[in-house]
UniProtKB/Swiss-Prot annotation:
Keywords: Apoptosis, Chromosomal rearrangement, DNA damage, DNA recombination, DNA repair, Isopeptide bond, Nucleus, Phosphoprotein, Proto-oncogene, Transcription, Transcription regulation, Ubl conjugation
Protein name listed in UniProt: TCF3 fusion partner
Record disease entry: A chromosomal aberration involving TFPT is a cause of pre-B-cell acute lymphoblastic leukemia (B-ALL). Inversion inv(19)(p13;q13) with TCF3.
Species classification: Eukaryota, Metazoa, Chordata, Craniata, Vertebrata
Modified residues (Phosphoserine): 167, 180, 188, 249, 252
Glycyl lysine isopeptide (Lys-Gly) (interchain with G-Cter in SUMO2) crosslink site(s): 216
SUBUNIT field: Interacts with NOL3; translocates NOL3 into the nucleus and negatively regulated TFPT-induced cell death. Component of the chromatin remodeling INO80 complex; specifically part of a complex module associated with the N-terminus of INO80.
Annotated source species: Homo sapiens (Human)
Length: 253
């Protein structure tokens, strides 16, 4: 009986304490006499300040975006480096190919020179030339320092210079014969024109090979081909020929 009364009293007290006016939320009894544990308080404070707020989310997004930007820039930098290395490798390959081609060309030239050397040695041996005991010096000159027309040291001593070979010998004019007319006399009455010494005539250009011969011919004869001959050189008739006495040939022993 007492138990039933005690339960009824607790139920009445509990209903009155936990009752709430209509329209309001259900009020729960406070825990631990209305005191909150310190651990729960710290957890709540740390949880709120840990990033559930708007500023924390923005900062984290900014950090992630900055990290993604750094990764993109690094990838672009690496891509440019790889492209530059690829171009450099291709250039080196081309240079190596050119060097290899030049090496093969030099090898062919060397083989040909060796064949010529062996041939010359056989020829000299057949003539009995003692070329192995002779001493000579080979002068190596840089390419482009002198032209291909420059004479070698051996030719400079044995052969005359090129200018001396091309220049014609100077000839002294022979004295005119007593019977020949003067240059200004004769039926034509024209003066002889001297041919210039540079090997040129009017309207005719001579090559260096033919110039010395042409100068020599014109200086020897001393007249032009289209000039009229003097009357003393014209052929006479048979009645104007001078008679020559016939001489008997001496008797042979």
């Amino acid at each position: 009986m007492e138990l039933e009364q005690r339960e009824g009293t607790m139920a009445a007290v509990g209903f009155e304490e936990f009752s709430a006016p209509p329209g309001s939320e259900l009020a729960l009894p406070p825990l631990f006499g209305g005191h909150i544990l310190e651990s729960e308080l710290e957890t709540e404070v740390e949880f709120v300040s840990g990033g559930l707020g708007g500023s924390g989310l923005r900062e984290r997004d900014e950090e992630e975006e900055a990290a993604r930007g750094r990764r993109r820039r690094q990838r672009e930098l690496n891509r440019r480096k790889y492209q530059a290395l690829g171009r450099r490798c291709r250039e080196i390959e081309q240079v190596n190919e050119r060097v290899l081609n030049r090496l093969h060309q030099v090898q062919r030239i060397t083989r040909r020179l060796q064949q010529e050397r062996r041939f010359l040695m056989r020829v000299l041996d057949s003539y009995g030339d003692d070329y192995r005991a002779s001493q000579f010096t080979i002068v190596l000159e840089d390419e482009g320092s002198q032209g291909t027309d420059a004479p070698t040291p051996g030719n400079a001593e044995n052969e005359p210079p090129e200018k001396e070979t091309l220049s014609p010998p100077r000839r002294t004019p022979a004295p005119p014969e007593p019977g020949s007319p003067a240059p200004g006399e004769g039926p034509s009455g024209r003066k002889r024109r001297r041919v210039p010494r540079d090997g040129r005539r009017a309207g005719n250009a001579l090559t260096p090979e033919l110039a010395p011969v042409q100068i020599k011919v014109e200086e020897d004869f001393g007249f032009e081909a289209d000039e009229a001959l003097d009357s003393s050189w014209v052929s006479r008739g048979p009645d104007k020929l001078l008679p020559y006495p016939t001489l008997a040939s001496p008797a042979s022993d």
